[in-house]
Amino acid sequence: MYDDSYVPGFEDSEAGSADSYTSRPSLDSDVSLEEDRESARREVESQAQQQLERAKHKPVAFAVRTNVSYCGVLDEECPVQGSGVNFEAKDFLHIKEKYSNDWWIGRLVKEGGDIAFIPSPQRLESIRLKQEQKARRSGNPSSLGDIGNRRSPPPSLAKQKQKQAEHVPPYDVVPSMRPVVLVGPSLKGYEVTDMMQKALFDFLKHRFDGRISITRVTADLSLAKRSVLNNPGKRTIIERSSARSSIAEVQSEIERIFELAKSLQLVVLDADTINHPAQLAKTSLAPIIVFVKVSSPKVLQRLIRSRGKSQMKHLTVQMMAYDKLVQCPPESFDVILDENQLEDACEHLAEYLEVYWRATHHPAPGPGLLGPPSAIPGLQNQQLLGERVEEHSPLERDSLMPSDEASESSRQAWTGSSQRSSRHLEEDYADAYQDLYQPHRQHTSGLPSANGHDPQDRLLAQDSEHDHNDRNWQRNRPWPKDSY
């Protein structure tokens, strides 16, 4: 009878008490696990912050140019919150080291740019795939190649655009210091162009003494297109059709330029075959293109005539090359030297390069470390972008422009009066050339080049298409301090 009695609520209350008793350890365990996770996260972030600080003292392993935009502030998976880099397409990054498969450590090449975490190509590819999946789920037609849009482009055009998008990597490996290349006022190999560029070379050598390497390049760098160097079939075709520069020679020159740039010194190329910015647009050099511009065609004609009959015979081709350069959009060049006075042109170029120097050299925390490092170890983590860069011997001294009395005389030639007309400028250039610099490209007597074609043939065959509107430029002064 007692066993059959029922007390309402007894079993429920006892069961509830048991539940509450057994749930307390579970709740405490969840809190403890959460605290452990937070503690581990803080420890990982602290270690990442320490590695970030240590990277400030490490040399630049390699550099890349970006093909996409990225905002590190919005990336919650950054190892240290708020320490991700922000960059736009066509920016330049110095990579210090690899942190993980998803992250590198480096800095944006910009004055005042600090060390930060940089997403690796794998990380950016993962982000891109997530965005595509999200777009498909939301049914956004613009993200799906305009599927279902009546005004969608023809299949061939759409397929071409898709193919281009698929083959654009997030980063292109470039030299750690962008090489400086002079073009204009006309064709290299003729006296007027050679003497004007020689005066600038001499100025740069003395102005940036100890911080600059000026080297001559005879190989045809226009053959160093990424699509050619990475495609054995194209390499064979070009090697058969070009007697002047084999692809192997061009590849060797490219590697030498990369090697020069590793020292983080300014690199200036005296490139025999480069007369137009389009020739280097698709290479991995990412050069700083400097246009030495004569104010008017009449001034250039007068300069050419002053060099004698041997130069007058080639007046037409030189003027055609001048017209080709003048027709380029300003965005094709990083610097346009259109000053009438040589001193002003030199200072213009020097100020631009000083800004670039500060942008590429992160200020050291210790005092007295203003100069460039005397020796930089070899490239680190080369496998990160799948690039194989071989170590080379120390820089060849004979490849650099020698410091001689001629250079000193050239420097003195433009340190005179600051008030000069075009006529006086012409006389300065003529004297500098006559006394200091004999033409080295074998065109002053009208002789063809080694492959039987004059350089202007290659220049005039260039496309009128200029796909390098990504360069920094301002109409009056193309060296803004905030451009890096």
UniProtKB/Swiss-Prot annotation:
Molecular functions per Gene Ontology: calcium channel regulator activity; high voltage-gated calcium channel activity
Biased composition (Polar residues): 409-420
Signal peptide: none
Pfam families from the UniProt entry: Guanylate_kin (PF00625), VGCC_beta4Aa_N (PF12052)
Gene3D superfamilies given in the database record: P-loop containing nucleotide triphosphate hydrolases (3.40.50.300), SH3 Domains (2.30.30.40)
Family per similarity comment: Belongs to the calcium channel beta subunit family.
UniProt protein name: Voltage-dependent L-type calcium channel subunit beta-3
Gene source species: Mus musculus
